[in-house]
């Protein structure tokens, strides 16, 4: 067997490409399932293996001159097994950036070098989620399926709009008859008939107009509800990394952009578009009256469009600046209210007020620029309208004087022209709203187009046992950030109580975040009961893992609602039992409303120790198989901590427990203590075993606390 088969480059390529598409892969499992003869993955088996990972793959033949049109990275397949990954094509420089699987390094190839290696076979790769994401991208096209869904209602709206346009056509004709026939021939009987008919038309026009507005508002309200529900569901399904990389105020500002879309959908903009679409009916009648006057109206329409096109880019930039400043204000406001205790304690209100005044002044200035530009745009529209009116008046009067047009026809023509120009002017005047909605859709798209935690096709076993394995874990929060965990190998048996200690920033809490599948490691696997968490349903996992943090958040509900948050229908007895284990029952019983006491926003009505004990009860109430205490007792007074530690045997019974603590006395009775330093496990053992090594880090930390 030659060297190219000693190392399976196909398997290595699959591992790299899967990682690129945020798909976890177990090389040993792939090898076991698809490399049955041990000679490496062939083309067919490689494609099957990729599809088993939910990757969308397609093998194609491409000439070199067509490679700059394909989606990269892609796998270049070679018959001798020495495949490589094509990552970038520069046709101008005739260079190719590849990842050499044999050298395990990127390389830049000249045209001649690439031609020598390329055999014409290439495999295109995309993740299913990315394909779905592209299809479901949120922009203006998102509303098309919604319109199709409610097509019956929109068809009714269109029918009503047609009748409204016909009624609008009848009214000018009546005025023409009155001016040219009734007044000239003094036909009172004809006048009475026309008046009655016009009254009937006006009544029907009002009824149909109100009906159209009602139908349209009803359907757009449904779309609004769907969009709002989709937005909130999507927001809660986003990974925790999304929120950690963005300011709270910025996310809130983006969500509030839904109001702009709502106002646009329920406003007059869309009905104006419908009115404009049926304007061809009026053009036909107007042309019959006077081609010259009609041409004046026709030539004015591009002027409206050109003026709007000229204003739009500037207006959009200023609206974008206004939004950014508003988002900054939202973030600063949320931050200030959240940190109000710190602000008051440090007496920094004047400094915070000064910052707010500057930011508010910037926002107001940006808003003023938008208003000024919008006013200029509207006045430009008015100028075009008045100019057209003057030209039509002058030309129409000439036509009447020359006998080519009657006075009644001129009046009717101007009324018909108004039916065309009015929606155009309305659309031009609400162009600012449309620009705002365009920005709102883009901003909202930042939320809705962000990939959620994947649930489809994930493992969802009924119950876990609690065996945890970290295998060759390497992790960093961002590609350009320092390594947080490096080569972590750790096995935790079912029912074991593990203490994790170390200096701040050593990676202790990150380890537990991987157990909760908040993140997927850059390299290696986290296994629970032998199942890779990268392939697990996050909700299934988190329902069976109880977590108590150093700073827990309670919702503005009753105590019983907070404890039974994950299962609101559970019995009161279970809630009370969990509260007793957490040492919370006694103080809850002393409250006037007991378990029905409203805790306030983020638990503001309770002390820090009380909030912590309720959080512990909340973690215990579902009887999780894995329980994580991340500095959970650091905020407790000694009496409360004593109650927790006294009940620790009951708390730990039948479950795997991980305790992260700076206070080493908290973990001295653990089955095993893991000592971490700079993202690595440097020591592990029982309390006495670690203390027996005087030069150990654990001994050093213990000595510091003893002193």
Swiss-Prot record:
Q: Which UniProt keywords apply?
A: ATP-binding, Cell inner membrane, Cell membrane, Hydrolase, Membrane, Nucleotide-binding, Transmembrane, Transmembrane helix, Transport
Coarse class of the protein's main subcellular location:
membrane
Annotated Gene3D superfamilies = ABC transporter type 1, transmembrane domain, Cysteine proteinases, P-loop containing nucleotide triphosphate hydrolases
Keyword Thylakoid assigned:
no
Residues annotated as binding ATP are: 502-509
Highest taxon of the lineage: Bacteria
One GO cellular-component annotation of the UniProt record comes to: type I protein secretion system complex
Membrane topology, from the record: Multi-pass membrane protein
* Domain ABC transporter, chain residue ranges per copy: 468-703
Q: Spell out where the chain crosses the membrane.
A: 158-178, 191-211, 269-289, 295-315, 388-408
A family per Pfam = ABC_tran
- Family matches, as SMART domains: AAA (SM00382)
> Extra notes?
The complex HlyBD-TolC (OMF) forms a single transport channel across the two membranes, allowing direct export of alpha-hemolysin. These channel is involved in type 1 secretion system.
Annotated protein name in UniProt: Alpha-hemolysin translocation ATP-binding protein HlyB
Tell me what organism the protein belongs to: Escherichia coli O6:H1 (strain CFT073 / ATCC 700928 / UPEC)
């Amino acid at each position: 067997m030659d060297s190219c088969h000693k190392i399976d480059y196909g398997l290595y390529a699959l591992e790299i490409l899967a990682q690129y598409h945020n798909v976890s892969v177990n090389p040993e499992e792939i090898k076991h399932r698809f490399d049955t003869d041990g000679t490496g993955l062939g083309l067919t088996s490689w494609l099957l293996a990729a599809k088993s990972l939910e990757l969308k793959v397609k093998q194609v033949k491409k000439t070199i001159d067509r490679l700059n049109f394909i989606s990269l990275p892609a796998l270049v397949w070679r018959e001798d097994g020495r495949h490589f990954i094509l990552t970038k094509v520069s046709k101008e420089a005739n260079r190719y950036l590849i990842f050499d699987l044999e050298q395990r390094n990127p390389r830049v190839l000249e045209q001649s070098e690439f031609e020598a290696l390329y055999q014409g076979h290439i495999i295109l790769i995309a993740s299913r989620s990315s394909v779905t994401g592209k299809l479901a991208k949120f922009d203006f096209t998102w509303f098309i399926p919604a319109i199709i869904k409610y097509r019956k209602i929109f068809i009714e709206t269109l029918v009503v709009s047609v009748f409204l346009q016909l009624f609008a056509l009848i009214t000018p004709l009546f005025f023409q008859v009155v001016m040219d026939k009734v007044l000239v021939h003094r036909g009172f009987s004809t006048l009475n008939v026309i008046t009655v008919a016009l009254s009937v038309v006006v009544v029907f026009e009002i009824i149909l107009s109100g009906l159209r507005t009602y139908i349209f508002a009803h359907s757009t309200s449904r779309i609004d509800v769907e969009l709002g529900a989709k937005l909130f569901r999507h927001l809660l399904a986003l990974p925790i990394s999304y929120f950690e990389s963005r300011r709270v105020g910025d996310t809130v500002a983006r969500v509030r952009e839904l109001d702009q879309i709502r106002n646009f959908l329920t406003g007059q903009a869309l009905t104006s578009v419908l009115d404009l679409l049926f304007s061809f009916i009026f053009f036909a009648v107007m042309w019959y009256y006077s081609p010259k006057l009609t041409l004046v109206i026709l030539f004015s329409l591009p002027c409206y469009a050109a003026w709007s096109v000229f204003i739009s880019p500037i207006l959009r930039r200023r609206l974008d600046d206004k939004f950014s400043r508003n988002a900054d204000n939202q973030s600063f406001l949320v931050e200030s209210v959240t940190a109000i205790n710190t602000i008051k304690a440090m007496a920094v209100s004047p400094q915070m007020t000064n910052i707010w005044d500057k930011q508010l002044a910037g926002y107001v200035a940006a808003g003023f620029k938008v208003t000024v530009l919008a006013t200029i745009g509207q006045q430009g529209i008015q100028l075009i309208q008045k100019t057209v009116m003057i030209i039509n008046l002058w030309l129409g009067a000439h036509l009447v004087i020359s006998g080519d047009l009657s006075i009644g026809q001129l009046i009717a023509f101007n009324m018909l022209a108004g039916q065309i120009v009015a929606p155009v002017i309305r659309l031009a005047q609400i162009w600012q709203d449309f620009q705002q909605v365009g920005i709102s859709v883009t901003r909202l798209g930042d939320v809705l187009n962000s990939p959620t935690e994947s649930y489809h096709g994930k493992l969802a076993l009924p119950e876990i046992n609690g065996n945890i394995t970290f295998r060759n874990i390497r992790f960093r929060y961002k590609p350009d950030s320092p390594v947080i965990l490096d080569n972590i190998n750790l096995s935790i048996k079912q029912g074991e109580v593990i203490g994790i200690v170390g200096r701040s920033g050593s990676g202790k809490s990150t380890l537990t975040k991987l157990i909760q599948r908040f993140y997927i490691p850059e390299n290696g696997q986290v296994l629970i009961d032998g199942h890779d968490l990268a392939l697990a349903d996050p909700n299934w996992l988190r329902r069976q893992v109880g977590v108590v943090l150093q700073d827990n958040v309670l919702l503005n509900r009753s105590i019983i609602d907070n404890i039974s948050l994950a299962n609101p229908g559970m019995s009161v007895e279970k809630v009370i039992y969990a509260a007793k284990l957490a040492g919370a029952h006694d103080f809850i019983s002393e409250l006037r409303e007991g378990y029905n006491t409203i805790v306030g926003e983020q638990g503001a009505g309770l002390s820090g120790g009380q909030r912590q004990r309720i959080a512990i009860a909340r973690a215990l109430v579902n009887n999780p198989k894995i329980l994580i205490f991340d500095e959970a007792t650091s905020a407790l007074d000694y009496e409360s901590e004593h109650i927790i530690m006294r009940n620790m045997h009951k708390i730990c019974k039948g479950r795997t427990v991980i305790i992260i603590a700076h206070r080493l006395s908290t973990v001295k009775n653990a089955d095993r203590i893991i000592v971490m330093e700079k993202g690595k496990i440097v020591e592990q053992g029982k309390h006495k075993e670690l203390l027996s090594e005087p030069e150990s880090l654990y001994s050093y930390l213990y000595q510091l606390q003893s002193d």
